[in-house]
């Protein structure tokens, strides 16, 4: 019995709906893995990161204030990422010298949340089996190297991997998303996987990480964020973004 026009009008939209559902089910949704860090950052309990609320992280109140000042003598206090970012652009910095490291770490964390909010679902992944272990530095880009001078930075740019730049001596895996690396010059470096998702709309799953640098016999410290990607499971990582 031939289909009439009414039947076709019903079947066609249903076919499209089923097809869209199949495609959506094959997509790899963004993963937000920074719940522990988020819990430490805010004084009160907030909802776990999700695609719906991740972009709100910058406006959430921390539950405490950070004192800032600038060369004109003007001072102000901020208690959320949005205000901190604006103050930094206006020339404010930590009011107390010993809080400068915290000030820079806060800026980095706030920028990380802004970058994570850009993640979308991906179609393919070459990082599903990624582990923060002894092998990771051999595939990570030299941009992750612990540098404290312009001269060192220029030298590092000529090297292909993080391991070749810092000569990692030992690794301590803290969890599936965090590991500590000790280099040949007394550097102590912590890598945290913050999130996974498609950052640059090419359909490939990328990874957002944070890196904290310090020295075992000194006070120097720095914090950095990166988006890394690779085109096969055996390929080295490249940097898509850095802050």
What are these regions (language model features)?
Residues 11-12, 22-23:
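Cleavable N-terminal signal peptides
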Residues 206:
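Acidic Asp/Glu-based divalent-cation binding sites
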Residues 1-10:
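Bacterial N-terminal signal peptides that target proteins for export
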Residues 25-197, 210-243:
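Beta-propeller-forming repeat regions
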Residues 202:
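Acidic carboxylate motifs that coordinate Ca2+ or other divalent cations, activating on Asp/Glu
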